[in-house]
Structure formats: structure tokens, C-alpha cells
UniProtKB/Swiss-Prot annotation:
Gene3D superfamilies: N-terminal domain of the delta subunit of the F1F0-ATP synthase (1.10.520.20). SUPFAM superfamilies: N-terminal domain of the delta subunit of the F1F0-ATP synthase. It is found in: Cell inner membrane. This is ATP synthase subunit delta. It comes from Salinibacter ruber (strain DSM 13855 / M31). GO terms for molecular function: proton-transporting ATP synthase activity, rotational mechanism. F(1)F(0) ATP synthase produces ATP from ADP in the presence of a proton or sodium gradient. F-type ATPases consist of two structural domains, F(1) containing the extramembraneous catalytic core and F(0) containing the membrane proton channel, linked together by a central stalk and a peripheral stalk. During catalysis, ATP synthesis in the catalytic domain of F(1) is coupled via a rotary mechanism of the central stalk subunits to proton translocation. This protein is part of the stalk that links CF(0) to CF(1). It either transmits conformational changes from CF(0) to CF(1) or is implicated in proton conduction.
């Protein structure tokens, strides 16, 4: 079974249990906190990923660190990951959980690359256009890349819309090359 399939299954199981037990909002907050902790505390990640640290030690670390701070379901879920030897996938599973929750709420991430910073008004307009096109709430992530020259590239999920000057110049270059090759072929044939 692929890692992606495993992360989706565990994330969906956590969501379903949290929903069934009426603790969805609490688990959402736990997941946010855990992801922030894992991101800022690389030694903790190394503990989870270490094959030399026994499962019972990892289990007691989870209980000691999180026991009273998070929802009981969250602790039980993390302990399950340890028992099933899936603790190395914790971060990916929690990320997938957040993606699943965003889908449930109708929120999508839009990765937008621009040549230079956007004015606030332009950013607001862009979000409005993207929300209208997708029918979903947009969470905008802006990146700058001067190589684009101008325009922008938008990635939402697997879809990419490239309206950069760089790509337009590349397309123009390809058309000119084809026209030149066609013209040369005609000249050679005459």
C-alpha cells in the first residue's frame, strides 16, 4: 500500500472518529498545535522517526507530553500510530487530516507565483476571481520569482494556470521556430 493511501486512510479515520465523538473542533486544534510543534521541534520528530527508540518509550513520551493538553482521542490516535509502526508518518497524516478538513469546509490552497509583490487591492481581486472560478474559499500563498518577468502562475491542487510573460515568450519562441522551419522546408522543396 502506498504511503499516500496510508496517510489518507489514517487521516480519514481520525476525522470520522472525531466527528462521531463530537470532538471535531478540539481535534482540529490539536492537529494544528501538533503540526506547529513538529515543525519547530525537530528533536521531537527525530524521536518519532528513530528506529532505535522502542515503541513503549515513544508511547510514554506521547502520554507524558500530551496527556492533559490535548483531546483523549488525539492521544489514543498517536499511540495507535506508534503501535502500528506508522509514527514516522505522523506529520504526513496530520497534514492529510488538515487537507481533508479543508475539503469539508470548501477551502482550497492556491499557490500563486508572481514576478514582484502584489498590492493589497490586487491580491483581494485575485482571491475574488479565484473563488468565483473554483466556487470555494481560497487560502492564498504568494511566492515571488523575478524570472517570470511579469504575470503570474496559479496552482490549485493539480491544476496550473500559467499567465506569466516568461511562458508567453516561450510559446512565441516556439511558434517563430516552427514558422522558420516551415519556411526553410518550403525553400528547400522549391
Amino acid at each position: 500500500m502506498s504511503q499516500r493511501t496510508v496517510t489518507r486512510r489514517y487521516a480519514a479515520a481520525l476525522y470520522e472518529e472525531a466527528n462521531a465523538n463530537g470532538v471535531l473542533e478540539a481535534v482540529d486544534e490539536d492537529v494544528r498545535m501538533l503540526l506547529e510543534s513538529l515543525d519547530s521541534n525537530r528533536p521531537l520528530v527525530r524521536v518519532f522517526e528513530s528506529p532505535v527508540i522502542p515503541q513503549d518509550k515513544k508511547d510514554s513520551i506521547v502520554r507524558e507530553l500530551l496527556g492533559d493538553r490535548v483531546e483523549d482521542l488525539t492521544v489514543r490516535f498517536l499511540r495507535l500510530l506508534i503501535r502500528k509502526d506508522r509514527e514516522t508518518m505522523t506529520e504526513a497524516i496530520l497534514d492529510q487530516y488538515q487537507t481533508l478538513r479543508d475539503e469539508q469546509r470548501g477551502i482550497v490552497d492556491a499557490e500563486v507565483t508572481v514576478a514582484r509583490p502584489l498590492a493589497d487591492e490586487t491580491r483581494t481581486t485575485l482571491v475574488g476571481v479565484l473563488e468565483e472560478k473554483t466556487g470555494k474559499e481560497i487560502r492564498l500563498h504568494l511566492h515571488e520569482d523575478a524570472d517570470l518577468i511579469g504575470g503570474l502562475v496559479v496552482r490549485i491542487g493539480d491544476r496550473v494556470f500559467d499567465a506569466s510573460v516568461r511562458s508567453q515568450l516561450g510559446a512565441l519562441h516556439d511558434r517563430l521556430r516552427e514558422a522558420t522551419l516551415s519556411e526553410n522546408a518550403l525553400d528547400d522543396g522549391a
